[in-house]
Regions:
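Small/polar/charged residue-enriched interaction surfaces, especially the RNA/DNA-contacting tracks
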Residues: 1-137
């Protein structure tokens, strides 16, 4: 099975496309979500929400270093539920676009060890850079 984050089986070569074109594409989708805001609301990602989730990813990275990956893995998987809470399918106060929830779900689903988490954190950092570079606010 091909690794999601790496171009080799030893997980030493991070896929460049994740940090370049894919990161830029994700950032653009977060700024201009697929559906317009309105009744079926799909808001653009705010910098506050981006910082909230990115801050959580960085905090988990620190916890992994202190306590080990296996102990923190359930908290990593819980990022999906936090995204779901911020992106209800019906009613409620939708704080993040569907595209951002899909991004987090996809990333978290592919995290199986410490190396994968590091790759995810680096990929997220690239997305943050492109988000601001593409005019996110």
């Amino acid at each position: 099975m091909e690794n999601y984050f790496y171009g080799d089986d030893k997980k030493t070569i991070l896929k460049e496309s994740l940090l370049t074109q894919q990161a830029k594409d994700w950032a653009k989708k977060f700024i201009q979500p697929s559906r317009p805001t309105g009744y079926d609301r799909n808001p653009p990602l705010s910098t506050a929400q981006l910082r909230k989730f990115y801050g959580e990813v960085k905090a988990l990275e620190t916890k992994i270093e202190a306590k080990g990956f296996e102990q923190i893995k359930p908290l990593i998987k819980m990022l999906k539920s936090k995204a779901a809470y911020s992106c209800p399918t019906r009613g409620g106060n939708k704080k993040i676009p569907d595209e951002f929830k899909i991004f987090l779900d996809e990333m978290v689903d592919h995290i199986e060890d410490k190396q994968d988490y590091k790759a995810f954190a680096i990929t997220f950092e690239a997305v943050v850079g492109y988000f601001y570079g593409e005019g996110g606010r």
